[in-house]
Amino acid sequence: TLYISQGKTEGITVEADDNIIPYIKTEIKNGQLNIFLDPEVIIRGYTAMNVSVSMPVITDINVAAAGRLEGSSPFTVNKLEIVASGAGSVKLEVKGSEVDVEASGAARLELKGEVEQFDLEMSSAATLKGWELRVKNCDAEISGAAKAEVSISGQLEAEISSAGILIYDGNPRITKQ
């Protein structure tokens, strides 16, 4: 699991079994932090790896495969892009101007906080639990068997296809459905 927090300084801490610590790699490429196991080594029989990262600003989150990300503190953002695919999961509290979410596969997201503009694109069997995410304006595209729950107070523009489901709380002005 990757735990992220917003702090004044940058830092990273890795907790794992002693036998895999030497094979855990961290690198920053093009401003992106990558955490992975050395691909040239086959490791069997280890328990979960936990990584804690602190940073002052976060702009992008990308969780794939069976990756798990949890916010250990609320984040204040101008614009945040979250991409979750495969069986990836994201649990985060955010406050800010704009949050864009793209979720596919069996991705699971649990978001809370306050956002002015929320752009949501979901497909396959992705799910969003966002009852505690208070959104002013929402633009949602949901397809496949994806399901989203969100609280909207201002304007809603939605395109739902296949067996997609959008459940919203509030009384938004619907401009497209």
Where are these regions (language model features)?
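Extended, compositionally simple hydrophobic/Ser/Thr-rich segments
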Residues: 1-4, 43, 50-53, 58-177
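N-terminal beta-strand/beta-hairpin edge segment
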Residues: 8, 16-20, 32, 39, ...
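Short, glycine/acidic-enriched capping/hinge loops at junctions between secondary-structure elements
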Residues: 4-7, 24-25, 45-47
